[in-house]
Amino acid sequence: MQKTLGNFAYSATLPSAKNDFTTIENEVIKLKIANKGGYIAEATLKNFEKFKKGSGQLVELIKNNNANLNIVLQTNDNRTLNTKDLFFEPTLTKIGADQVLSMKLKSGPNSFLEYKYIVKPNDYMIGFDVRSQGLNQVLNTAKPLDLEWDLKAFRNEKSISYENKYTE
């Protein structure tokens, strides 16, 4: 594992290093964050139904791998790693009324890349921060980080013309 992942093999040895999810939600939205990759694997709107009211099918913005978030990491030992393939350690806390999910990709006990998701009460907007600590000896700082974010949107209404009319 050390041979393939270098310093980030540390994250693969943690108890959270499994294909599992952490849920963070409020009254209007529910998110499932993947431990592998640290990205949003599912996003469901709790107060909106697909097709017609009473159908019971909630609008799912993200599901079935239709979204991808990845940062390409160039290491000092000439490895190219993708965050989507690495395990993050989740920590869910509350700060006041806000829920904060910290997803850390660790190269050691005190060195990491962190994705932080912040969900406020009754709010559809999600705060998202990326920060690092202690990675200057691990990452090649002469090369820029490439952020890749893709989303293939689902059709949530039966009529595509209706959906296009109210979507921008």
Where are these regions (language model features)?
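Soluble non-transmembrane domains of integral membrane proteins
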Residues: 1-168
